[in-house]
Design a protein with these regions (language model features):
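General small-molecule cofactor/ligand-binding pocket signal
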Residues: 5, 89, 123-128, 138-140
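Active-site neighborhood of divalent metal-dependent phosphoester bond hydrolases
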Residues: 94-120
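Active-site metal-binding motif and surrounding structural segment of the metallo-beta-lactamase
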Residues: 45-90, 95-96
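Active-site-proximal loop/helix segment associated with metal-binding centers of metalloenzymes
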Residues: 104-107, 129-181
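Conserved beta-strand hairpin/beta-sheet module of binuclear metal-dependent hydrolase folds
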Residues: 5-53, 168, 172-187
């Protein structure tokens, strides 16, 4: 059985005024006896909401980061302070590059804090291919692009060897959770 809770997004507070919102995303789910987080939003607000919902971050077994943009990894520092043991599954490319958005007047850096990866390297599992996390949870690492990318990607850039290039979402990780009557797919930003 799957138990899934949205911890942070940009709309959750309309249901409960005590829950915080932000441009970002974080899910908590339980399956196969595991407590997991998928993304951490842009800040530590996910932890406020987890506490209000009775979810204990220190008991999380696995954290999956969907990609290297800070609206999904911004709460990582807080998570690492609160949870001392969970493995963190992420694409091998998520912390490798600098990511920029041009949705505003000036370009903004939306990269994850790579110093956390360096400091806590032993906690990270770098994905280069799909991975079976548990009997019912599959991590799907993005690899082939044989379709048009979403229109929103036109505002995103990646810096490779000092040169800006169009963002190709090679760092995305989606979740597939098998349940009794089908599957649940979590794709945080769906850049690909």
């Amino acid at each position: 059985m799957l138990d899934l809770t949205v911890l942070i997004d940009n709309n959750a507070a309309f249901l409960d005024k005590e829950l915080l919102t932000e441009h970002g995303l974080s899910f908590y789910f339980r399956v196969d006896g595991l407590a997991c987080l998928y993304d951490l939003g842009a800040s530590d607000k996910w932890l406020n909401n987890a506490n209000k919902l009775g979810i204990h971050a220190e008991e999380v077994d696995h954290l999956i980061l969907s990609h290297g943009h800070k609206d999904h990894t911004g709460g990582l520092s807080t998570f690492l302070q609160v949870n001392k043991s969970a493995k963190i599954f992420v694409s091998d490319k998520a912390f490798k590059y600098k990511y920029l958005t041009y949705r505003h007047e000036k370009p903004r850096d939306i990269s994850s804090d790579s110093s956390l990866f360096a400091k806590y390297a032993d906690r990270f599992v770098l994905l280069t291919e799909d991975c079976l996390l548990s009997p019912h949870v599959y991590l799907i690492h993005n690899r082939v692009f044989e379709h048009r990318l979403p229109v929103g990607n036109q505002f995103l850039r990646i810096v490779v060897d000092g040169e800006e290039k169009p963002y190709i979402p090679h760092d995305e990780v989606a979740l597939v959770i098998r349940i009794d009557d089908g599957i649940v797919i979590l794709s945080a930003c769906s850049h690909s």
